[in-house]
Amino acid sequence: MKVKASVKVLCRNCKIVRRKNVVRVICTNDPKHKQRQG
């Protein structure tokens, strides 16, 4: 899980999800693409 100021989609399987007022990127294809804004 990467913690970044600005999260970006890295591939076509990445999805931007908002959970508990935190923007996250989840990816079904590559777990390395997981990100959290903070």
Curated annotation (Swiss-Prot):
Q: Which domain of life is it from?
A: Bacteria
Segments spanning the bilayer are none
Return the InterPro entries for the record: Ribosomal_bL36, Ribosomal_bL36_sp
Q: Which Pfam families match?
A: Ribosomal_L36 (PF00444)
Supply one GO BP term: translation
Which keywords accompany this UniProt record? Answer: Ribonucleoprotein, Ribosomal protein
Q: Into which family does the record put it?
A: Belongs to the bacterial ribosomal protein bL36 family.
Identify this protein by name: Large ribosomal subunit protein bL36
Organism of this sequence: Buchnera aphidicola subsp. Schizaphis graminum (strain Sg)
